[in-house]
Amino acid sequence: MKKIILTTAIGIFLSTSVLSGHHENNEVVLPAKITKNDIAGDIYKHPDMVKSTNNGNTTLDVTTLVSSDGKFGTGMYRSGKIRFEITEPYGVDEFFYILEGSITLISADGTVTKTNAGEAVSIPKEWTGIWDTDGYSKI
């Protein structure tokens, strides 16, 4: 009987902890939302937007969420014209939806995957090849 009561008490405690939406340090965990206005471009006005220029290409990057284990992130990214070869495995599994522009991915075996605005693509972390674009925005 003690075992049943203890198991029930632990179950109630754990479910209450999970359902309360609190972290270990008692912070409330909230969903990360990207609004229609953000998607239309307002997100790039956020104060935490990171702008970088490398070899004449300017990128805008806004991270809206990084998981507590650091293995998952969300946000929006905009890039100008760029072409680069990825000779080492990509390093992360990535899914994204293209809002504007297009990206052409040429795999190491020559297979061409062109993804346009309104389409999505998933890149496995083992992927190598050429990334080519005249510019795009992705979520």
Where is each model-derived feature located?
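Short hydrophobic/aromatic-rich beta-strand segments that constitute the beta-sheet cores
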Residues: 74, 86, 105, 138-139
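Short, conserved beta-strand element in jelly-roll/cupin
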Residues: 90-105
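Hydrophobic helical h-region of N-terminal Sec-dependent signal peptides
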Residues: 6-10, 14
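Positively charged n-region of N-terminal signal peptides that target proteins for export
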Residues: 1-4
